């Protein structure tokens, strides 16, 4: 296990949930269900309400790989939309291009998806893009560059991720042509519950 995997392993143990949605971290949680530095059934320190909100915010930050600057900006955008702010926040994060690439199985993880986008492998609506934080809208389409080696690689990724793929109804995948079409944002039921988004709303609302 390399250094990055060890760091991610500590994060899933700290949060007590597999925020990276990869089987290897389920194994880590099963083997070591307690947080790093805590052994056996040691008593947990009491966490304040602020501490709980901070933990939920960190879960979302690390799940989607967003920065400390990007997340509050996304929250501000979510507040502008009609409806429930917590759902709006998750909906925006789910429709960022790197997450769509990950959900469709083009990549093994969101970090892998960010690399794919930043390396210019992805074509969005006919134009090559390199910014993994682009928010997609209905009818946006993603293709892979017309390079045989790249298409073969992404095709292989799709095959290998098929068993664990969590593809919302709003994403249409054509695995034969390596094409993704965004139809609509996912419903709340289609978004894995990896954090309490209402606590994140409370966290940022107090700092507005």
From Swiss-Prot:
Purpose of the protein: One of the primary rRNA binding proteins, it binds directly to 16S rRNA where it nucleates assembly of the body of the 30S subunit.
Stretches assigned to the S4 RNA-binding domain: 95-159
GO molecular function annotation: rRNA binding; structural constituent of ribosome
Organism field: Borreliella afzelii (strain PKo) (Borrelia afzelii)
Record protein name field: Small ribosomal subunit protein uS4
One Pfam family from the record: Ribosomal_S4
Family: Belongs to the universal ribosomal protein uS4 family.
UniProt cross-references to NCBIfam families, sorted A to Z: PRK05327.1, rpsD_bact
BP terms from Gene Ontology: ribosomal small subunit biogenesis; translation
GO cellular component: small ribosomal subunit
Subunit structure: Part of the 30S ribosomal subunit. Contacts protein S5. The interaction surface between S4 and S5 is involved in control of translational fidelity.
Listed SUPFAM superfamilies: Alpha-L RNA-binding motif
The keyword RNA-binding appears for this protein: yes
Alphabetical list of SMART domains matching this protein: Ribosomal_S4, S4
Keywords for the protein's UniProt record, in alphabetical order: Ribonucleoprotein, Ribosomal protein, RNA-binding, rRNA-binding
């Amino acid at each position: 296990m390399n250094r990055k995997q060890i760091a991610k392993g500590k994060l899933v143990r700290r949060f007590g949930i597999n925020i990276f949605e990869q089987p290897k971290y389920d194994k880590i949680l099963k083997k070591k269900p307690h947080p790093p530095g805590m052994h056996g059934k040691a008593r947990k320190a009491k966490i304040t309400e602020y501490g709980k909100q901070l933990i939920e915010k960190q879960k979302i930050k690390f799940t989607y790989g967003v920065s400390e600057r990007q997340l509050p900006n996304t929250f501000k955008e979510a507040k502008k939309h009609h409806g429930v702010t917590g759902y709006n926040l998750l909906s925006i994060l789910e429709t960022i291009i790197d997450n769509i690439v990950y959900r469709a199985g083009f990549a093994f993880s969101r970090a892998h998806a960010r690399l794919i986008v930043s390396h210019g492998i992805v074509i969005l609506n006919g134009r090559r893009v390199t910014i993994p934080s682009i928010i997609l809208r209905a009818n946006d389409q993603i293709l892979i560059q017309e390079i045989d080696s790249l298409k073969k690689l992404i095709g292989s990724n799709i095959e290998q991720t098929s068993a664990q793929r969590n593809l919302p109804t709003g994403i249409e995948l054509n695995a034969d042509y390596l094409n993704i079409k965004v139809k609509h944002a996912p419903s709340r039921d289609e978004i894995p519950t990896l954090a309490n988004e209402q606590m994140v709303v409370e966290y940022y609302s107090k700092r507005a």
